[in-house]
Curated annotation (Swiss-Prot):
It is an enzyme of class 3 (hydrolase). The keyword Transferase does not apply. Pfam families: Abhydro_lipase. This is Triacylglycerol lipase 1. GO terms for biological process: gibberellic acid mediated signaling pathway; glycerolipid metabolic process; lipid catabolic process; regulation of seed dormancy process; regulation of seed germination; response to gibberellin. SUPFAM superfamilies: alpha/beta-Hydrolases (SSF53474). Expressed in seedlings, roots, leaves, flowers and siliques. Specifically expressed in the epidermis. It catalyses: a triacylglycerol + H2O = a diacylglycerol + a fatty acid + H(+); 1,2,3-tributanoylglycerol + H2O = dibutanoylglycerol + butanoate + H(+); 1,2,3-trioctanoylglycerol + H2O = dioctanoylglycerol + octanoate + H(+). InterPro entries: AB_hydrolase_fold, AB_hydrolase_lipase, Lipase_euk. The gene is LIP1. The keyword Lipid metabolism applies. It comes from Arabidopsis thaliana (Mouse-ear cress).
C-alpha cells in the first residue's frame, strides 16, 4: 500500500517532482499584489468576493502606471489546474500576459479559484474539513467564474473580455452555456481550449487514468492535492531518488513544450503548484474515460438524487451564443488539449472562432513561453481590439 500511496500522490502533480526540496521550504504566498505586481512597478489592488456556496475568492486589479492607465475594457484572466493568478505574471513584464495587457491599456482583473493559496477561505469551513474540498471544475465554472464575471460587470458597468488557459477554458465553456453569464461577456480568448479530453496523449496522464489512480486516492481517504505538504514532498523525494527519472516530468504530464524556460523552474516553484481537490481530478479523469463534457458522475443512484437522471447532464456547447466572438490558441505538441479534441470542440460550437495554431507549441508554452508575446499574445490583443466598440480607446 505504501508504494501505491507514493505513486498516486506523485503522479498528480506537474511541478513537484522537479525540485522537491524547494517546495518543502517555500512559504505560501498570500498577496499577489505585494509579491509580484507592485515590485514590477504596476498598480494593483486586492478584491474579494463570496460565492453563493460560501467560498471567499481573491481577485486582483492590475494597471500600468504609464499613460494608458486603465483606458481600455475590463479583461478577466482565468488560470488552469494547479495554478493561480500568479501564473500570468511569472515571467518578465515584457513576457507576461498580465503585464502586457495592462501596458496596452486594458483594465486587467486576475481570478483565483477556491482552494488556491489566494482563495483559501470559506464562511464556515476550514481547509482541513472534508467538505471544504467537495467540488470539481463544474463548481469552479458555475460559482467561481460566473460570480467573478458578475463582479467585474457590476463594477465596470460594461461587458468583459475573458481569457482562459487549460482548466480555465473548461470553466469558460461550461459557464458560457449559461445565458446570464454569456450576456456579460464581450468576447473570449481561450488558450489550450478543452471541453473534451478523450484523446489525451500525455503518457503519465494516460497511465494514471488506466490504473484508476483517482479512485485509489479516494480509497486512501484523501480530499485535497497539496504539493507543499511535508508528507507529499518527502514521498516524492523518496520516489525520485533512484526509482524513476523525474527530470522530464513536465513533458510526461503536459506533452513537449518548445519555449518553456526550464532554467527558471526553481523560481516558478516559489508560486506553483497550488492545491486542488481530489474530486476535481476525478471529474477530469471521467472526461478522459467517457469522452463527454458533462457534470460530475456520482454513479447511478446518487445521480438520480442529485440530477434526477441516471447519467450526469452534459454541457451543450451549442448553447453558447453564436454571436459571442471567440478566439482560440492551441499547439501541435500539447498532450492535454489534443488537436483532435480541439477539433471536436470546434465542431460542437455554433460559431467559427478565430484560430491560432502553432505546430511546435505545448501546453505550458501558452502561459510561460518566452516567445509567447510575439507568437500568441499580439494576435489575442488584435482580436480584442477589433471587438472594442468604443472609439475612445
Amino acid at each position: 500500500m505504501k508504494w501505491l500511496l507514493v505513486a498516486v500522490l506523485t503522479s498528480l502533480t506537474i511541478f513537484s517532482a522537479l525540485t522537491q526540496s524547494h517546495l518543502l521550504h517555500g512559504s505560501p504566498v498570500n498577496s499577489l499584489c505585494a509579491d509580484l505586481i507592485h515590485p514590477a512597478n504596476y498598480s494593483c489592488t486586492e478584491h474579494s468576493i463570496q460565492t453563493k456556496d460560501g467560498y471567499i475568492l481573491a481577485l486582483q486589479r492590475v494597471a500600468s502606471l504609464g499613460p494608458r492607465l486603465q483606458s481600455g475594457p475590463p479583461v478577466l484572466l482565468q488560470h488552469g489546474l494547479f495554478m493561480a493568478g500568479d501564473v500570468w505574471f511569472l515571467n518578465s513584464p515584457k513576457e507576461s500576459l498580465g503585464f502586457i495587457l495592462a501596458d496596452h491599456g486594458f483594465d486587467v482583473w486576475v481570478g483565483n479559484v477556491r482552494g488556491t493559496r489566494y482563495s483559501y477561505g470559506h464562511v464556515t469551513l476550514s481547509d482541513t474539513d472534508k467538505e471544504f474540498w467537495d467540488w470539481s471544475w463544474q463548481d469552479l465554472a458555475m460559482y467561481d467564474l460566473a460570480e467573478m464575471i458578475q463582479y467585474l460587470y457590476s463594477i465596470s458597468n460594461s461587458k468583459i473580455f475573458l481569457v482562459g488557459h487549460s482548466q480555465g477554458t473548461i470553466m469558460s465553456f461550461a459557464a458560457l452555456t449559461q445565458p446570464h453569464v454569456a450576456e456579460m461577456v464581450e468576447a473570449a480568448a481561450l488558450l489550450c481550449p478543452i471541453s473534451y479530453l478523450d484523446h489525451v496523449t500525455a503518457p503519465l496522464v494516460e497511465r494514471m487514468v488506466f490504473m484508476h489512480l483517482d479512485q485509489m486516492v479516494v480509497a486512501l481517504g484523501l480530499h485535497q492535492i497539496n504539493f507543499r505538504s511535508d508528507m507529499l514532498v518527502k514521498l516524492v523525494d523518496s520516489l525520485c531518488e533512484g526509482h524513476m527519472d523525474c527530470t522530464d516530468f513536465l513533458t510526461s504530464i503536459t506533452g513537449t513544450n518548445c519555449c518553456f524556460n526550464a532554467s527558471k523552474i526553481e523560481y516558478y516553484l516559489d508560486y506553483e503548484p497550488h492545491p486542488s481537490s481530489v474530486k476535481n481530478i476525478r471529474h477530469l479523469f471521467q472526461m478522459i474515460r467517457k469522452g463527454t463534457f458533462a457534470q460530475y458522475d456520482y454513479g447511478y443512484f446518487k445521480n438520480l438524487r442529485t440530477y434526477g437522471l441516471s447519467k450526469p447532464p452534459e454541457f451543450i456547447l451549442s448553447h453558447i451564443p453564436a454571436s459571442l466572438p471567440m478566439w482560440m490558441g492551441y499547439g501541435g505538441t500539447d498532450g492535454l488539449a489534443d488537436v483532435t479534441d480541439v477539433e471536436h470542440t470546434l465542431a460542437e460550437l455554433p460559431s467559427s472562432p478565430e484560430l491560432l495554431y502553432l505546430e511546435d507549441y505545448g501546453h505550458i508554452d501558452f502561459v510561460l513561453g518566452s516567445s509567447a508575446k510575439e507568437d500568441v499574445y499580439k494576435h489575442m490583443i488584435q482580436f480584442f481590439r477589433a471587438k472594442v466598440k468604443s472609439s475612445s480607446w
